[in-house]
A protein has these predicted regions:
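AAA+ P-loop NTPase domains with strong preference for DNA replication initiators
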Residues: 1-48, 52-66, 73-82
């Protein structure tokens, strides 16, 4: 439900903040483009908008895994989402 999505988005915001601080010098411009989007997620009021943007975060995590993170480090977060 929507409350669960919001809780999950809050977790992702915290987690991504940690990732950004660790890999700030490594992330390329394309990945940095998602930072502002993640910051806006709390403002979405509809389930569809939240889910659409959650999919963008999932895409970002895949890019991070392929570029700067150990494989599978975040996969378990998404097993039950989609």
């Amino acid at each position: 439900n929507y409350d669960n999505l919001l809780s999950f988005l809050n977790l992702l915001i915290i987690l991504y903040s940690d990732i950004r601080s660790l890999y700030n010098g490594v992330l390329d411009i394309h990945l940095k483009g998602y930072i502002n989007e993640i910051a806006k997620y709390k403002n979405y009021l509809s389930y569809d908008a939240a889910k659409k943007n959650l999919e963008l975060v999932y895409s970002l995590v895949l890019k991070l895994q392929n570029n700067v993170m150990p494989k599978n480090i975040l996969n378990n977060l998404f097993v039950n989402i989609f």
